[in-house]
């Protein structure tokens, strides 16, 4: 943590002192044990060092997983990060990108392929890609097949959208499915392969929904960064939504348009919220407590992040983030099934109160409240089923669901 970040956390704690115990608890669970050493094998060492280089938060997520899942998820992340680097590199011509994306899965079986790249911190990943392939080939054959099939599917989906403006919400859903939902499906399949969840977890509805929830939260967050991308913007907000509020998406950059910009933002958040309920319902199938807690972290922080983005004009000026203390509170309150339902119920209740106080005249507030009430009902049903004296209140694994 930099001095600037440390100062920001301290300022937040002065305003929200009740979050301090949760920060301590999270620090104890995250940093209380010695950090996992970097592997001695050169290929695995490269992969874990690269993971720490290209991502701030994901290494902590990987380290929270059972040991047998850490290599597979680390490698899968790097495969997709390499694919994403091709998609995002604005120095590549469209035809070059499309061609490379459609055959990238073939390079995941080729220890001799690499690519020169000037794309910042990802250059080393692309230039030493054979080391990633080397570790991939040490994974169980079924896991390798799942990952290569997903890279092929995702790469072709990305290629379809390289020169395509996202016009409709259906196209927006499809793009997010290709780049995130399909990833969730592959990860869940591997978790089931390792017997860390019941077969019911391998559900398109759950895995795709959690992926779409995470991706849409990122797309909303990245408005200011993406609209100012050089040499040209690349935006993913669907025209079917933003076209109701402006003639051009860039109009939201203008201070005089901030009121309509925030209305559009609230519409985007409301759209993303429809993926929370199916994500919640699928969580009960993850019977390994470590896997459950890692996925619950993703779900509650995404829900909390949407509530931070909602009605927040700063989205159009900067990258809006949640307070670290708030994240700690959400994570530490969601370590088992009842805790997850209670946390999401509280988030939904607070969100609904804000809607009634802050955005009563917003054009999409009725739909926002309807979706929040549906989430509330799911949480209450979950608590009625799982928050019993039979031991589910303890810090146990997610229960094996009963039919």
Curated annotation (Swiss-Prot):
Role description: Catalyzes the biosynthesis of presqualene diphosphate (PSPP). Works in combination with SSL-2 or SSL-3 to produce respectively squalene or botryococcene. In most other species, farnesyl diphosphate (FPP) is converted into squalene in a two-step reaction by a single enzyme.
Binding-site residues for Mg(2+), renumbered to this chain: 84, 87-88
The organism's place on the tree of life at top rank: Eukaryota
EC number: 2.5.1.103
Listed cofactors: Mg(2+)
GO CC, alphabetical: endoplasmic reticulum membrane
Claim: Metal-binding is one of the keywords in the record: yes
Protein name: Presqualene diphosphate synthase
Gene3D superfamilies cross-referenced by the UniProt entry: Farnesyl Diphosphate Synthase (1.10.600.10)
Protein family: Belongs to the phytoene/squalene synthase family.
Molecular functions per Gene Ontology: metal ion binding; squalene synthase [NAD(P)H] activity
Keywords: Magnesium, Metal-binding, Transferase
């Amino acid at each position: 943590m930099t001095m600037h970040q440390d100062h920001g956390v301290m300022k937040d704690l002065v305003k929200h002192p009740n979050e301090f115990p949760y920060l301590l608890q999270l620090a104890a669970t995250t940093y209380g044990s010695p950090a996992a050493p970097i592997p001695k094998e050169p290929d695995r060492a490269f992969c874990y060092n690269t993971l720490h280089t290209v991502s701030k938060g994901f290494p902590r997520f990987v380290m929270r997983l059972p040991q047998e899942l850490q290599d597979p998820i680390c490698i899968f992340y790097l495969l997709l990060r390499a694919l994403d680097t091709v998609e995002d590199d604005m120095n590549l011509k469209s035809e070059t990108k499309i061609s490379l994306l459609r055959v990238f899965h073939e390079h995941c079986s080729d220890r001799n392929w690499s690519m020169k790249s000037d794309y910042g911190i990802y250059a080393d990943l692309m230039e030493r890609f054979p080391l990633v392939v080397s570790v991939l080939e040490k994974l169980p054959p079924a896991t390798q097949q799942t990952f290569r099939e997903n890279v092929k599917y995702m790469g072709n989906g990305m290629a379809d959208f390289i020169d395509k403006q996202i016009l409709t919400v259906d196209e927006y859903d499809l793009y997010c499915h290709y780049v995130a939902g399909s990833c969730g499906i592959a990860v869940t399949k591997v978790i089931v392969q390792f017997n860390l969840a019941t077969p019911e977890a391998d559900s398109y509805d759950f895995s795709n929904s959690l992926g779409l929830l995470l991706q849409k939260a990122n797309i909303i967050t990245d408005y200011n960064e993406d609209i100012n991308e050089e040499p040209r913007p690349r935006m993913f907000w669907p025209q079917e939504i933003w076209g109701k509020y402006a003639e051009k998406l860039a109009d939201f950059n203008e201070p005089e348009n901030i009121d309509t910009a925030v209305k559009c933002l609230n519409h985007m958040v409301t759209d993303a919220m429809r993926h929370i309920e199916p994500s919640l319902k699928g969580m009960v199938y993850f019977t390994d407590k470590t896997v459950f807690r890692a996925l619950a972290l993703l779900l509650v922080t995404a829900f909390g992040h949407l509530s931070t983005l909602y009605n927040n004009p700063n989205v159009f000026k900067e990258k809006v983030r949640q307070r670290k203390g708030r994240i700690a509170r959400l994570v530490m309150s969601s370590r088992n099934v009842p805790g997850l339902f209670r946390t999401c119920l509280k988030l939904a209740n607070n969100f609904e109160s804000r809607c009634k106080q802050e955005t009563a005249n917003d054009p999409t507030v009725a739909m926002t409240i309807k979706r929040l009430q549906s989430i509330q009902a799911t949480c209450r049903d979950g608590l009625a089923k799982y928050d019993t004296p039979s031991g589910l209140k303890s810090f146990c694994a997610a229960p094996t669901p009963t039919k």
